[in-house]
């Protein structure tokens, strides 16, 4: 603003003033009047030229004065070909800072490359096996840089733990097979509407599916959701925590090439006895032979696809299949419930035909043959299925009667554990006193004295 005000003040000094000749007579002839007009126009043009020259010289002097005194903080660009472009001190300072930042970035990048390209240390044996590079050639140097860079990012791409599940329990408490189930669009379906907001539906037959198969399998929920959003849903599906053995969330997945993969090799289980049921091909891309592909459930209340898988899963567990992968591979690309029902019916028909053949041949004691049962025989799978259904009915009855009590006891134990940790951190004297009292009660209890 200062330079503009000075400039306009100087320009006002050189403002052209109109010049009119004095006329002595009021009335003149037409000839003298035209001659006077010509003279006046010439004088006016000369005055304008002088004013222009004076104005340009005054403007230049004003700009020089402003530049020399450092009063102009705004960049000014003159006419082309009339001197260099003016750059303010602020812009010069910014350019200097940008140059420092650029060279600093180059220095840090170069230093990082030199550091990452150093020879492997004694604690990098595994990395050296994956990316062997023992020399100092540019290729070896670059291989070490690439190896350490990949190792750095793998911390965020690999699952949170090398063993996602604890070691299996000893016999007879363990389950010989592990069933890995997805959550979204397999067991539940969530949708959002303007009227109701978010709502989550449970798939038909889900309670029976989880409860019945938990007698054969170690049921593991492996979801793409994070733990904070998945846990409330799991608590609704299995409120008494009797069917689901473990829950694995997004933190346990593997991120590779933009895909979220459920790598079963991290489960700490024998893959020959692991079955995954999922709706997303990316999930089983590492172990496709262990997967049963399902179409996403869209909320149909009459759906029976999930319950239709029970006979096949039941057959695998009852027959103690050593490796589930060949069995699952034989069902790929087929409707599993219908295909299994067809195969089982074929076995049942063959068994009945053999029984009829023996019956026709006459297996009476008169001819020295063995007696044939009057009732048609049953498949082993049918006999075991009847037993398991009866056991599940008893289990379901027990859970319905004692489930709320079990849940209250579990919550009380959790609250006691939280209190114990708090007291141990802030009131260790109280914890020691409680332990002494418990020991004294155990020593002087009637049961202890009787045993002695």
Swiss-Prot record:
CDD domains: HAD_FCP1-like. GO terms for cellular component: mitochondrion; TIM23 mitochondrial import inner membrane translocase complex. The chain crosses the membrane at residues 100-117. Coiled coil: none annotated. The keyword Manganese does not apply. GO terms for biological process: intracellular protein transport; protein import into mitochondrial matrix. Gene3D superfamilies: HAD superfamily/HAD-like. GO terms for molecular function: ATP hydrolysis activity. Essential component of the TIM23 complex, a complex that mediates the translocation of transit peptide-containing proteins across the mitochondrial inner membrane. Required to direct preproteins in transit and direct them to the channel protein TIM23, and possibly facilitates transfer of the translocating proteins from the TOM complex to the TIM23 complex. This is Mitochondrial import inner membrane translocase subunit tim50. It comes from Schizosaccharomyces pombe (strain 972 / ATCC 24843) (Fission yeast).
């Amino acid at each position: 603003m200062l330079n503009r005000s000075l400039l306009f003040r100087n320009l006002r000094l050189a403002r052209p003033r109109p010049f009119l000749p004095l006329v002595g007579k009021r009335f003149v002839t037409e000839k003298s009047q035209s001659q006077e007009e010509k003279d006046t126009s010439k004088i006016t043009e000369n005055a304008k030229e002088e004013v222009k020259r004076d104005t340009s010289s005054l403007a230049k002097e004003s700009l020089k004065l402003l530049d020399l005194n450092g009063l102009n903080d705004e960049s000014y660009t003159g006419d082309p070909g009339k001197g260099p472009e003016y750059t303010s001190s602020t812009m010069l300072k910014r350019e200097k800072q940008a140059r420092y930042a650029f060279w600093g970035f180059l220095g840090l990048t170069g230093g990082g490359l030199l550091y990452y390209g150093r020879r492997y240390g004694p604690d990098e044996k595994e990395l050296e096996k994956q990316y062997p590079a023992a020399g100092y050639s540019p290729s070896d140097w670059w291989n070490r840089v690439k190896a350490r860079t990949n190792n750095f990012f793998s911390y965020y791409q690999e699952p949170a733990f090398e063993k996602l599940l604890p070691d299996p329990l000893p016999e007879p408490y363990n389950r010989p097979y592990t069933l890995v189930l997805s959550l979204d669009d397999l067991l539940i379906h969530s949708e959002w509407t303007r009227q109701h907001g978010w709502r989550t539906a449970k798939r038909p037959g889900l309670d029976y599916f989880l409860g019945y198969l938990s007698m054969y399998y170690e049921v593991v929920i492996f979801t793409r959701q994070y733990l904070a959003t998945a846990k409330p849903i799991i608590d609704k599906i299995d409120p008494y925590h009797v069917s689901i053995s473990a829950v694995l969330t997004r933190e346990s997945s593997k991120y590779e090439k933009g895909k979220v993969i459920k790598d079963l090799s991290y489960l700490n289980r024998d893959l020959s006895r692991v079955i995954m049921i999922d709706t997303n091909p990316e999930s089983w891309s590492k172990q496709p032979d262990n997967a049963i592909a399902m179409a996403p459930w869209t909320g149909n209340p009459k759906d029976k696809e999930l319950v239709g898988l029970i006979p096949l899963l039941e057959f695998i567990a009852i027959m103690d299949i050593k490796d589930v992968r060949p069995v699952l591979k034989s069902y790929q690309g087929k409707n599993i419930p219908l295909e299994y029902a067809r195969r089982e019916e074929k076995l049942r028909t063959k068994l009945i035909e053999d029984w009829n053949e023996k019956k026709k041949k006459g297996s009476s004691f008169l001819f020295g043959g063995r007696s044939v049962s009057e009732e048609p025989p049953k498949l082993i799978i049918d006999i075991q299925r009847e037993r398991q259904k009866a056991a599940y009915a008893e289990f379901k009855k027990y859970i319905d009667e004692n489930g709320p009590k079990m849940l209250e006891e579990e919550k009380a134990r959790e609250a006691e554990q939280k209190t114990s940790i708090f007291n141990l951190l802030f009131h260790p004297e109280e914890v020691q006193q409680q332990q002494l009292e418990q020991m004294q009660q155990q020593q002087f209890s009637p049961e202890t004295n009787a045993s002695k």
